[in-house]
Amino acid sequence: MITHYSLPITRYPLPRFLTLSQIEFPSQFDVLVVGAGAAGLYTALCLPESLRVGLITKETVALSASDWAQGGIAAAIAPNDSPSLHIEDTIQAGAGLCDVAAVEFLAQQAPKCIESLVNLGVAFDRHGQALALTLEAAHSRNRVLHAADTTGREVTTTLTDQVLRRPNIQVIQQALALSLWLEPETGHCQGISLFYQGAITWVRAGAVVLATGGGGQVFAQTTNPAVSTGDGVAIAWRAGAILRDLEFVQFHPTALTKPGADRFLISEAVRGEGAHLVDNEGRRFAFDYHPAGELAPRDVVSRAIFSHLQRTAVDPATAHVWLDMRPIPEDKIRLRFPNIVKVCQRWGIDVFREPIPVAPAAHYWMGGIATNLKNQTNIPGLYAVGETASTGVHGANRLASNSLLECIVFGAQLANLTPADLIQHTETPALPTREFKIDASEWQHQQSQLAILREKLPRLVWQSAGICREQSTLSVAIATVKSWQQDFAALPLSQFLLSLQPNEPVSCNFSDTDQQLRLWAETGNLLDVAYLILKSAAFRIESRGGHFRLDYPHSNPDWQVHSLVQKHQWWQSPIMKS
């Protein structure tokens, strides 16, 4: 039995948010959790309270992709629903690549997870005393719980409040993880290197949990926040972790497309409640591509919009279609989607009188660090949870509102971690502190090079590995990214930091230290993530789920397998049956 479902609501005095200048960073924890979205927060809460836990986030605990999640969290709790139906829908959406055992575990644990969240104080919407359930695309039943259209914010706010009340959890904000710290003889993960307070330090841990979210910022069009730079996947890959299914990226069909506006996600729940997807003539064109129309799986709807614009728009790259909410009763719109109404109003759109301009954008990464049902990776002592992990649940295409659920169900597995599971390390003395120095003009030139790379890379990846891909553009993009990786490695800061020995601290004394070192680290991570996605997309010579190739437009039974990569080696691996 999994004990986390009876998580107590702790009532310790609420501490202030701590800045790095206010704390003394310990040199060792029992467990380090990197990332403070839903996966990281819930993992930290579920870890035994006897363990000393460090929760590391490069921003604040109030900023993550989970906080942006609108639609909700799926669970089969209705009388006419069941985990078996939830399993069927998830497998159907996954286009033949779901690991059945992982899907069964997810759906069967979902109702108890909802009970746990309610007990912790998450205020889901209700109809009277009953939890309100809505329908989303590719679900056969109303099973999506929500808190208006800001479910992610409600979940993360509640979890953050609980985390800050736990005396065994120390939250370290604005600290940037740079690399894993492996024991050279055993290959065990014994901690991380990270940047904080203008210095690089090494922190030991009996276990490291990566919960850093996705990598949407590698694409020019994305619904992800700026923090989503694929840090966990890149860090794990460089350390030798096995990664899985990196070519599968979910492009959300309906992101707000307005000059000057962020690509704000218009939740799938809007279409589930009855909104229509129409073209400039007001025609519901999605039915040309799938019998379910705008309620087809996300990859189908995204390609429908892409194909329709390619055929009808003068400039498909900047064109859009329309999402018309007017078929939904006005009172329901105000009740269910107040944030969407508010954001659209901010950009001059009255959803009660006119449709919303929308187009697809990168939204969710199905691939990630390969894990088992206990979140273990191939590196002893290293775990991964949430979007940064590949559990086998989503297959080639994630079912709507299964992402928050995955964070909670698999984060809960860390409740079973015991002191006996923690890697015991031999203490080694820290090496003398090195100082990074650079000429002012050279530093300015380096800043300019990083900024140019950061601007060019997402455009290249969007054009070559976006909704539709083919070998010719992938090959050119791979060669370009390799060249940029070489340019990045030749930077003075790269040469200095990549030459560090384990447990060798660094002090940095140059202007804008925090901002510039973060730019350096994120740019390096995005270059690696781009390379991995491009190579994985070229490796899979078929179309399936979130991976569509113009030169191989159909699924191939020989490719009903996972793609795995370790370092620079790619290979196929069979899916896991129940």
Curated annotation (Swiss-Prot):
**Which pathway does the protein contribute to?**
Cofactor biosynthesis; NAD(+) biosynthesis; iminoaspartate from L-aspartate (oxidase route): step 1/1
Reported EC number(s) for this entry are: 1.4.3.16
Q: How is the cofactor bound?
A: Binds 1 FAD per subunit.
Under InterPro entries, the record lists: FAD-dep_OxRdtase_2_FAD-bd, FAD/NAD-bd_sf, Fum_R/Succ_DH_flav-like_C_sf, Fum_Rdtase/Succ_DH_flav-like_C, NadB, Succ_DH/fumarate_Rdtase_cat_sf
Q: Where is this site: Important in orienting the L-aspartate substrate?
A: E136
Q: Which PANTHER family match?
A: L-ASPARTATE OXIDASE, L-ASPARTATE OXIDASE, CHLOROPLASTIC
Protein name according to UniProt: L-aspartate oxidase
Q: Which organism is it from?
A: Nostoc sp. (strain PCC 7120 / SAG 25.82 / UTEX 2576)
